[in-house]
């Protein structure tokens, strides 16, 4: 697989949200706005890239029996680092995302890429895989957050452009399921036409 394909596969072919349906907890819970979705996606991307690099570099030294716990320790280290950085530089976003930042440790996207890709490939390829999957996750969370924000409150990225109240359901959990379902259908329809 070429270097460019390692990055682009996460955007379309192996999109974590719309194709693989991974990471649904943060996807549904943090996408009440485009900014929240983008922030969660970027936070996950940061951890994904760095953990892929380290896991790929040390994969040959990790015994099979402690492989998964070792991955969790590596991922938890980067999540802790991320928490410190976010608390220092973007405290408002850190407060908004709250509990979902520490939950990146057990996010199946990050663990899945460590197990399925990083431990079997080179450091460079693992970094590119992390970038691609992370960008795909970030884009899908941002789009979902944007749709929910527009329909739920009549704003985009915090800028109100529709007067009056939006559709309350889209700000709440049921709206997350509805918006995600429709976006999955649209994404799959568009990608199936592209494949033909």
Q: Where are these predicted regions, by residue range?
A:
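Transmembrane alpha-helix boundary signature
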Residues: 81-96
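Loop-to-helix transition at the N-terminal end of transmembrane alpha-helices
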Residues: 35-52, 56-73
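C-terminal transmembrane helix-loop-helix hairpin of multi-pass membrane proteins
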Residues: 5, 125-196
């Amino acid at each position: 697989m070429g270097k460019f394909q390692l990055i682009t596969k996460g955007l379309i072919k192996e999109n974590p949200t719309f194709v693989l349906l991974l990471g649904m907890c943060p996807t549904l819970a943090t996408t009440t706005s485009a900014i929240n979705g983008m922030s969660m996606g970027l936070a996950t991307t940061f951890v994904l890239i760095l953990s892929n690099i380290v896991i790929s570099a040390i994969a040959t030294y990790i015994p099979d029996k402690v492989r998964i716990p070792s991955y969790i320790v590596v991922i938890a280290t980067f999540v802790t680092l991320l928490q410190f950085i976010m608390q220092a530089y973007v405290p408002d976003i850190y407060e908004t995302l709250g509990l979902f930042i520490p939950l990146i440790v057990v996010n199946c996207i990050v663990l899945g890429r460590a197990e399925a890709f990083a431990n079997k490939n080179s450091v460079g390829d693992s970094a590119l895989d992390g970038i691609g999957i992370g960008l795909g996750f970030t884009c899908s969370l941002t789009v979902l957050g944007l749709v929910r924000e527009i329909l739920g409150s009549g704003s985009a990225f915090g800028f109100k452009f529709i007067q009056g109240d939006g559709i309350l359901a889209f700000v709440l959990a049921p709206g997350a399921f509805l918006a995600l379902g429709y976006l999955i259908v649209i994404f799959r329809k568009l990608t199936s036409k592209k494949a033909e």
